[in-house]
Amino acid sequence: MLESTPTYLIKNARLVNEGRSYEADVLLSGGRIERIDDRISPKNNTIQIIEGGGKLLLPGVIDSQVHFREPGLTHKGDLSTESLAAVAGGVTSYIEQPNTVPAATTLKLLEAKFARAAEVSWANYSFSLGASNSNIDELKRASKRDVAAIKMFLGSSTGDLLVDDPAAVERIFREVDHQLIAHCEDEPTMRANLERLIEERGGREHLTAADHPLIRSEEACYLSSSRAVALARETGAHFHVYHVSTGKELDLFDAEIPLAEKKITAEACVHHLWFSDEDYAELGNRIKWNPAIKTVADRDALRAALLDGRIDVVATDHAPHTLEEKQRMYVDAPSGGPLIQNSLPAMLELARRLDIDFARIVELMCHQPAILFGIQERGFLREGYHADLVLVDPHRPYTVQAPELFTKSQWSPFEGRTFAARVSQTWVNGLVVYRDGKPRNMPAGQRLVFDRGW
């Protein structure tokens, strides 16, 4: 980082924060938000003044599920390229997942990732420790202050981290006093679906991306999620279900109590909110994700749950693969794709089309990830908090184009789509790291610190 962080005065921006939208000035100094007021006059001529008239000023987005592919899969992406894509999209903090090579299933391997991020990350960072069938002692040693969460793959996905021993899963729920998170799909159901479809189609080579939601079906998701949620209720564990993809699963989650009082929580991802099975004909493997993108009814149910409180956070599951890998035949193409650079504009566009208040998007992408994970002094525009902010121009449409993407994979399922709002400028810890389409200064990310309160 720079030896000293510049002082910025953002004038006349419209703040979208804590359920309100209002015009104010914001003073950033020493990497923190020093003051928020109706009108602030510069104290001296060293203050850099940013004119925010007509623009929205939001807390930096906290993306609580990303896969940045380092170590071991760095031809797809790495901590530098993908965190740069993050800040270009207004994402100032992220929680990265353990399915790298090697998988981050020990604290030693996890600390190596922290050390690398400290050198190169443009955004603030933390990492989840991966659970296996046999590493419960390591999981128990993970600090709730320094490690984001314990990640369980209850259904197979990229990497080799499947936790398929019921006794091991139950021990984790009962004995590990940490935030538990999970990818929930029932492996036997998916295997049976795959075998049946291969037989029906006359061979695996005849399967297409449109078969993905038939293999990774509603039944597979609900069986796994419902078992895990029942176990969490029985044991009293703090449990968060990643990328809920079906309307049926939403019935597992409580909308009646405040997030701060919930122990069982749910995430929806941008791609499940945007796309449906009707898009496979056009996009094919580009929208092959695990869990699968499902029906229009599922997508619409997830959208409704953004408003009623059953969905607590929105994340990306940003998971880059090369376009060459995605263009293989369906059964050989990996699942996942890059989304992080366009996630905030996409969600603001969705809000605009569905008449959802932008303040609700800020809650789901900024405030509530901070509350759920207990991230200290981030996720809100508050005096004294770290100066992680994003300035958005709501009246400057842009069309997603591959050459403008910073992800190493250089493609997006959103290519060709036009969004009404674009990210103009991003601050991380008080430093401008992105402005008008280009990275600025140098990586400024810091390690996230957690205060769970339990």
Positions of predicted regions on the chain:
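Histidine-rich, glycine-flanked metal-binding segment
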Residues: 1-9, 14-59
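Divalent metal-coordination and catalytic microenvironments
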Residues: 13, 31, 54, 65, ...
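Metal-associated gating/positioning segment near the N- to mid-region
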Residues: 55-120
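Short catalytic-loop micro-motif centered on adjacent basic/acidic residues
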Residues: 95-96, 126-129, 238-243
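A glycine-rich helix N-cap at a beta->alpha junction
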Residues: 115-131
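Histidine/acidic residue-rich metal-binding segments in metalloenzymes
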Residues: 137-314
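His/Asp/Glu-enriched, well-ordered alpha-helical/loop segment
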Residues: 206-227, 231-236, 286, 307-314, ...
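C-terminal cap of metal-dependent C-N hydrolases
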Residues: 329-332, 383-449
